[in-house]
């Protein structure tokens, strides 16, 4: 549970812009690259974990990673302007003259050594973030926006906010795997979670590798395992093939199968909490199913989009 939000006037450092440099790039799996950033300002980057939302401020359209330029929209003013201020300035710039923004969750933060890891899933065809990561080299510059530890509010940019809940449904596609991994690692002793992963290549599963899972898990098949603290039932829903007469693909079909088995309990038992993350359209459809058809209260569902099919997801 996050610390209470301070009054607005006491929040000059809840959110900051961090100039960073690429320190290392490592391929984790067929479609994941880990980019390690360093920068003196990262000593103040808050290591809140979970599904902490950050922005990568990418190069201007047409610029190579090593030619990074930041458009004039006030992002590096001190203290960093409120997001609504600099974002409005950014939106007023012509599209070809403003830096591309993309949402991520840190894989790891190490403020003491001024480092931050971001695991980038490489989409095909490559969008701006994927193209940047594939071309990036140590020494390239970037700006990251995220939480500033000097404020002390541990809830900024975090959607995962369970209170007294200890039964969880966690649904994620590859873009949300770093956040899902953080969340699973945070589960308290005695918690139980159903973890549904939407995936194209099982080798890209960065989440269940930390669990005691033996062998592969077929589409819509499940296996039960334990973390040091919690019991996790894992379902890997492979993308690309339909899994039933309703033509639903991958994790959306898996969620409906889960709903048929557990939906009534999740609706009636206030201990249940749901977290959905990935492609914006899919998370919206799943949330609508959970609330409209299963009747789960909206205040027990957190959902966020990391990307959108067919267009940019910013803001």
What are these regions (language model features)?
Residues 1-315:
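Extended, composition-driven regions rather than compact fold-specific motifs
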């Amino acid at each position: 549970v996050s610390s209470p939000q301070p009054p607005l006037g006491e929040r000059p450092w809840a959110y900051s812009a961090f100039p960073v440099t690429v320190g290392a790039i490592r391929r984790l799996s067929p479609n994941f690259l880990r980019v390690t950033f360093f920068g003196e300002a990262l000593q103040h980057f808050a290591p809140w974990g979970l599904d902490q939302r950050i922005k990568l401020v990418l190069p201007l359209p047409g610029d190579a990673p090593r030619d990074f330029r930041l458009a004039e929209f006030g992002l590096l003013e001190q203290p960093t302007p409120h997001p609504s201020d600099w974002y409005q300035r950014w939106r007023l710039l012509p599209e070809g003259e403003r830096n591309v923004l993309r949402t991520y969750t840190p894989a790891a933060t190490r403020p003491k050594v001024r480092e931050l890891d971001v695991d980038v899933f490489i989409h095909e065809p490559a969008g701006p973030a994927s193209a940047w990561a594939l071309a990036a080299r140590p020494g390239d510059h970037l700006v990251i926006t995220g939480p500033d530890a000097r404020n002390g509010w541990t809830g900024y940019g975090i959607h995962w906010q369970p209170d007294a809940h200890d039964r969880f449904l966690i649904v994620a596609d590859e873009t949300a795997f770093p956040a899902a991994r953080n969340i699973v690692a945070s589960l308290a002793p005695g918690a139980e979670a159903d973890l549904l992963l939407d995936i194209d290549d099982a080798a890209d599963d960065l989440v269940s590798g930390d669990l005691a899972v033996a062998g592969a898990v077929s589409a819509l098949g499940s296996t039960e395992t334990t973390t040091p603290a919690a019991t996790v039932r894992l379902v890997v829903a492979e993308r690309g093939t339909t899994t039933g007469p309703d033509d639903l693909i991958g994790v959306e079909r898996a969620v409906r199968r889960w709903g048929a088995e557990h939906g009534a309990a999740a609706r009636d038992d206030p201990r249940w909490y749901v977290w959905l993350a990935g492609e914006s359209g899919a998370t919206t459809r799943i949330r609508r199913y959970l609330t409209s058809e299963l009747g789960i209260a909206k205040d027990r569902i957190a959902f966020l989009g990391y990307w959108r099919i067919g267009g940019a997801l910013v803001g």
